[in-house]
Design a protein with these regions (language model features):
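Class I S-adenosyl-L-methionine-dependent methyltransferase catalytic core
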Residues: 1-120
Length: 120
């Protein structure tokens, strides 16, 4: 059985992953190497978004446990109208903002708060 590759570690305690499809295909996203932060593997994201591809155009995406932002940025890359990312770790939220700026992600909102509190 093959084992999923873990994202490569890069400088400054950051790791990277790639966006699989859409307008940002093959672009790299950086995220902090934090305990418990495990991005959704490429193969899982590819399968999920292949299923959802006809449903994404114009939808508003809410990612409650954003982490690396992989799921949300993938959705925005593939045609979602807007994206709201909630990440309770303030350092990772800053990293998500940097990635959104790098991608010129219009319609992306990043909130640094606990999703359970935000949902109340």
């Amino acid at each position: 059985m093959t084992r999923a590759k873990s994202p490569a570690t890069s400088k400054g305690g950051r790791r990277e992953l790639r966006i699989i499809g859409g307008r940002w295909r093959s672009r790299k996203l950086q995220f902090l190497d934090l305990p418990g932060l495990r991005p959704t593997p490429d193969r899982v994201r590819e399968t999920l978004f292949n299923w959802l591809q006809l449903e994404l155009a114009g939808v508003h995406v809410l990612d409650l446990f954003a982490g690396s932002g992989a799921m949300g940025f993938e959705a925005l890359s593939r045609g979602a109208a807007s994206l709201t990312l909630l990440e309770r770790d303030a350092r990772q939220a800053v990293c998500l903002r940097e990635q959104a700026t790098k991608l010129e992600a219009v319609g992306c909102q990043i909130l640094s708060q606990d999703c359970q509190h935000w949902l109340r």
